[in-house]
UniProtKB/Swiss-Prot annotation:
Together with its co-chaperonin GroES, plays an essential role in assisting protein folding. The GroEL-GroES system forms a nano-cage that allows encapsulation of the non-native substrate proteins and provides a physical environment optimized to promote and accelerate protein folding. One of its GO terms (molecular function) is isomerase activity. This is Chaperonin GroEL. The keyword Membrane does not apply. ATP binds at residues 29-32, 86-90, 413, 476-478, 492. It catalyses: ATP + H2O + a folded polypeptide = ADP + phosphate + an unfolded polypeptide. It comes from Methanococcus vannielii (strain ATCC 35089 / DSM 1224 / JCM 13029 / OCM 148 / SB). Its EC number is 5.6.1.7. Forms a cylinder of 14 subunits composed of two heptameric rings stacked back-to-back. Interacts with the co-chaperonin GroES. Keywords: ATP-binding, Chaperone, Cytoplasm, Isomerase, Nucleotide-binding.
Length: 536
């Protein structure tokens, strides 16, 4: 296929246009007075949201050159979301600021490679300063504050703090849609492990790319399943019962996987295959934990058991199983309470007797999964549109809270970035790398400036006031006053800020060093009308 190529400044200008379209759409949502964006859906009601990554994912531009710029910024939001689960709008604002300032410098004749190096070194310095400002989260009140800031709702913040208290920081919290108007918290016994579906063709919800099985049978084996004859009796038995099936195995290979997918697509079987978690002895222990929780047997080669001889009585069950591309969550296993209690005691004994720190951590992780249970936040609302928006906010707040527990908290509302800027005043590099440092320094003011502008104020004036204030004093956009941010409960997870800085700098550096863009030449649409002979 023929290609269209643009070079130099023309190429970078097109990228910048795409960056601006996406960033300008996303950044209106930043801060407590940020606005919402309405997204048309091909079916159902429109989606109203202020979640940066959700908005970014919907944007595709008609001009293929500009679309590349938009897709690069979309990558910033997606990566920030993958790492920290929040801070996608901040990352987008930082990236746009770095790209705009950087392109000005390159148009004026600066060397893009040296500018890129300067950006990378300055970002590394900024992240190291951020780490010194991080403060470990202390108690439920700070957990509630982090969640409240992220969700923009104190009630949601308190609900998440309560959920964390119930299951502990190693427990699992999920968000579901309720059938009532109320948003409630429910704690269910359950277990999650870090393995997702073997094939995406096995999902039950293509929009969210998840598989949900209600009241499934559960087959657990430490073998590779490579021969269809091995599991045919189990498949036939579950098909007759009209219940779904979860298969946990070392692997499901070749023709077996193909057969499962084909039967799933035809509607003959509702089956999901996942790989067994961990390796070696840790895997054996984890599979036994799952078996006890679900009242099943581990079909093991070490025990001389054969899959062909397995019947329904060897399978376990649970109220619900949720599988994503990365995780499997088993809720409401039918295992006997005394067996689970006995297993927990056994693991506790192993923890106290082992001298290996690695093994101790591994056993503690298994203990948390077996005893922690699952907290389910059921989101209620009057309309479907509001329900979707509220669910997204709760998911963001949950991610922000987990990030805060991992790496601590810092002053929120863009304040910590201004504090980093103050400490970076003396940080200089030689030659054109200095330009990269200045680009990062200027970008650090962008989130606070945008928060103030979204509140209807002059952003640059607010930035100067915070710059000249004492350490820790920032701008509370909700009340439009200058306060001690941490004391006022306006805090951000350090991980979210770090991820936003690193991802925005990475993509900005890519845009600035781009010298050519190549896209496919669109095909000319041929007219369906046949050529008519000329009339004489």
């Amino acid at each position: 296929m023929a290609k269209i190529i643009k070079f130099n400044e023309e190429a970078r200008k097109k990228l910048e246009n795409g960056v601006d379209v996406l960033s300008n759409t996303v950044k209106v949502t930043l801060g407590p007075k940020g606005r919402n964006v309405v997204i048309e859906k091909s079916y159902g009601s429109p989606l109203i949201t202020n979640d940066g990554v959700t908005i970014a994912k919907e944007i595709e531009l008609e001009d293929p050159f500009e679309n590349m710029g938009a897709q690069l910024i979309k990558e910033v939001a997606t990566k920030a979301n993958d790492v920290a689960g929040d801070g996608t709008t901040t990352a987008t604002v930082l990236a746009q600021a770095m790209v705009k300032e950087g392109l000005k410098m390159i148009t004026a004749g600066s060397n893009p490679v040296f500018v890129k190096r300067g950006i990378e070194k300055a970002t590394k310095k900024a992240v190291s300063i951020l780490e010194t400002k991080s403060k470990k989260i202390a108690g439920n009140s700070e957990i509630a504050q982090v969640a409240s800031i992220s969700a923009g709702d104190e009630e949601i913040g308190n609900l998440i703090a309560k959920a964390m208290e119930k299951v502990g920081e190693n427990g699992v919290i999920t968000v579901e849609e309720a059938k009532s108007l109320e948003t409630t918290l429910e704690v269910v016994e359950g277990m999650q492990f870090d393995k997702g579906y073997i094939s995406s063709y096995l999902v039950t919800d293509p929009e969210r790319m998840t598989a949900e099985l209600d009241d499934p049978y559960i087959l657990i084996t430490d073998k590779k399943i490579s021969n269809m004859k091995e599991i045919l009796p189990v498949l036939e038995a579950t098909a007759r019962s009209s219940r779904p099936l979860l298969i946990i195995a070392e692997d499901i290979e070749g023709d077996v996987l193909t057969t499962l997918v084909v039967n799933k697509l035809r509607g003959t079987l509702n089956v999901v295959g996942v790989k067994a978690p961990y390796f070696g002895d840790k895997r054996i222990g984890a599979l036994e934990d799952i078996a006890i929780l679900t009242s099943s047997q581990v079909i093991s080669k070490d025990k001389g058991m054969e899959l062909e001889k397995v019947d329904i009585s060897s399978l376990g069950s649970a109220k619900k199983v949720k599988v994503t591309k990365d995780n499997t969550l088993i809720i409401g296993g039918i295992g006997k309470e005394k067996d689970i209690t006995s297993r927990i005691s056994q693991i506790k004994t192993q923890i106290s007797s082992t001298t290996s720190e690695y093994e101790k951590d591994s056993l503690k992780e298994r203990l948390a999964k077996l005893s922690g249970g699952v907290a389910v936040i059921k989101v209620g609302s009057a309309t479907e549109t509001e329900l979707k928006e509220k669910k997204l906010r709760i998911e963001d707040a949950l991610n922000a809270t987990k990030a805060a527990i991992e790496e601590g908290i810092v002053s929120g509302g863009g304040t910590v970035l201004i504090e980093i800027l103050k400490e970076m005043e003396s940080f200089e590099l030689s030659g054109e790398e200095r330009i990269g440092v200045n680009i990062v320094k200027k970008a650090l003011t962008a989130p606070l400036k945008q928060i103030a502008e979204n509140a209807g104020l002059e952003g640059s004036i607010v930035v100067e006031k915070v710059k000249n204030a004492e350490s820790g004093i920032g701008f509370d956009a909700a009340k439009e006053e200058y306060v001690d941010m941490i004391k006022s409960g306006i805090i951000d997870p350090a991980k979210v800020t770090r991820s936003a800085l690193q991802n925005s700098a990475s993509v900005a550096a890519l845009v600035l060093t781009t010298e050519a863009i190549i896209v496919d030449k669109p095909k000319k649409e041929e007219s369906d009308t046949p050529n008519m002979p000329m009339m004489m």
